[in-house]
Each structure stands twice: as C-alpha cells, then as structure tokens.
Regions:
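Flexible, glycine/threonine- and acidic-rich loop/arm segments that mediate assembly and lattice contacts
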Residues: 1-325
C-alpha cells in the first residue's frame, strides 16, 4: 500500500521497525572535516576572523662582522574577515499525531524519525554548500571549496583579500589538457596528480582529494591495474569508498544524491589541505535545536535546528584544483 502518511508509517503495527533510508546523501567533505577536527565552535563575534602570515620579512641580511644592520618593517600578517551564514530546518508535530503515536501502537517514535530526517536533510544541504562556491540561494549559502580553490587564481577575492594583491593566498590550478596532452584517464591521472600536488608540497601535501566521477573512476582503474589499490580504512569503515593515490585520500564527491544537491564537476578534483579550512559555528548554534516552541493558536509543537557560522579558509596556497574543462 503506497502513499502512507507519516503517522500511518510510524504507528501501524506488524511492520519492519526500521525505515529504509532514501534521504541521506553521500557527504564525504563534511565527514572529512569532522574527522580532522575542523568543525569548530566559536564564542560570539560580529564576524569570523582567520589570520595568515602572508609575506616574508624583507630584512633578512647577510653581514660582515662590523657591517651596519639595515632596520625596517614590512607587513607580514593580516586577516580574513567572513560574515556568518544561517541554515535552519524545522520539525512540526501536531497534537493528533502525538496522541496517535503513543503506547503500544508507537513502535517508532514519530518525532524522533522526523528529527532524523531533518538532520539528514540539513547535512545534505551543508555538503552541497561546502562543495559549492558560496553564491547559491541568493548569496545565503555557506562558502565552499570553490569559493577558495578556483581555476582563475588571480581573479576575485575571499575574506576581503584580493588574490591579485596577495600571491600567497592563491591556490594552484592545473588545466590538465593544456598543461599536458589530451584528456585525463587511468593511464595518466597518477602522474598528473603528482605534478599538481608537488606544486603545493610543504611538509606533506593535501591529504584529501575531492574528485568528480570521471577522475575518481580513472584513479581506481589506475591503482587496480598496478595492484596498488589501498584505502583510508577509517573513511571506508564509515561508508565512504575511497582510493589512496599520490598520498592523498581520493573520495567521490558525488554518488547518490537524494536531495538533488549539486556536486563538483565530473572531470575535476580538489586537493585540499584540511588544516587550512574550518567550519566555524557559533556556540549554541552548531546544528543544534533551539528551545522547542509551542504555537499559541495551533495544536502544534515546533522544533527548529539551527546552524550559524561559516566555512572559512586561512589561505588556499597549499591546495590545488586539477580540471579537464
């Protein structure tokens, strides 16, 4: 019997007591940020700051024993300024549903199930934002990797700093067919990734490679052919298929998207040094429910989960994008 209402699906007896999940998407970037400890809580503030040491001290000198030292100052430290964004998801239950979904008939808690769907829906949307460029939903979206790691590295700005003025905040962008010859496939993706990673190498390189389907499939084929297919066990056990290539954990950016949220293009990948990025959320609004509300003129209870913060970057100079188009 199709088309059951939520109250029917959660209250009727003699049913499988675990609903199938046709809501949760593949959310590899959000998972990786959490495991790296880059989802942080901040305590207030009008804006969110990230500091960066962006320039060399220009007064390093080699001198003779009696030579006069030239004294001077040049600015070496500055900051990025980010405006917070807000994302919410409401859950509503009315008095009739609460009355029906109780006692022996309530083998599934209706409110709990709705809250789980709401949480999954919220995380799906956050993954969409984190993989995006921050301009979606009329500019209300959180910033994403494409806000900071761009294909035109001298244009635009982020955090109030112009890429044209600060070369140290620019990521590396490699147009694969232009830099090399032909499209990227299993026969050449390893060497192309090595080239791209080496351009940003410093005490190790990017640890996460967020890849579109074409690049991800090519990497899997390349590693399988060489019998060198290894995986990040922690991500695999959490349900995120991956392949380790050139020292980076490459994960599929797309996969199944029940929400229909956009993901990065199939023929590109982002080499991300996670320590330079953070999802900074205000205390008390870290994807948490605010106090439950009761309508004054309706028999409904309302729970609203709120996230207020921003996806920030303290410099994309150690990350790269490689793309075929």
């Amino acid at each position: 019997m199709a088309g059951l209402s939520e109250i029917q699906a959660t209250t009727w007896e003699y049913r499988e007591k675990k609903p199938a999940d046709a809501v949760a998407d593949n959310i590899p970037l959000l998972f990786a940020m959490r495991k790296k400890g880059r989802v942080l809580t901040i305590n207030g503030g009008r804006v969110i700051w990230e500091d960066i040491k962006y320039a060399q001290n220009n007064y390093v000198q080699r001198i003779d024993p009696t030579e006069e030292i030239t004294l001077g100052y040049n600015q070496t430290i500055t900051g990025f300024e980010y405006s917070p964004k807000i994302i919410v998801v409401p859950v509503v239950v009315n008095a009739l549903e609460k009355a029906q979904n109780q006692g022996d008939a309530a083998f599934l808690d209706l409110l709990e199930q709705r809250n789980q769907v709401a949480e999954d829906s919220l995380m799906n949307n956050m993954e969409t934002d984190l993989q995006g460029d921050g301009v979606g939903f009329g500019g209300k979206a959180f910033a994403g990797v494409q806000s900071y790691i761009v294909t035109n590295t001298t244009a635009g700005s982020y955090g109030g700093l112009a890429r044209s003025a600060y070369s140290s905040i620019r990521n590396v962008a490699v147009n694969a067919p232009t830099t090399f010859t032909g499209s990227t496939d299993s026969s050449n993706i390893e060497s192309r990734l090595r080239y791209s990673k080496n351009l940003v190498l410093r005490n190790g390189g990017p640890e996460l490679c967020l890849a579109g389907a074409t690049y991800y499939n090519a990497a899997c084929d390349a590693m399988s052919a060489k019998q060198r297919f290894t995986q990040n066990q922690e991500m695999f056990e959490a349900g995120f298929d991956n392949v380790v290539i050139e020292g980076m954990t490459m994960v599929l950016a797309g996969g199944k998207s029940f929400s229909g949220g956009a993901r990065i293009a199939a023929d590109r990948c982002y080499g991300i040094r996670l320590e330079n990025f953070a999802l900074k959320m205000y205390k008390g609004f870290n994807f948490q429910p605010v106090p439950e509300r009761v309508s004054v003129n309706q028999l409904v209870d309302i729970s609203i989960t709120v996230g207020i913060g921003q996806f920030t970057c303290n410099g994309a100079g150690l990350s790269f994008v490689m793309h075929d188009s």
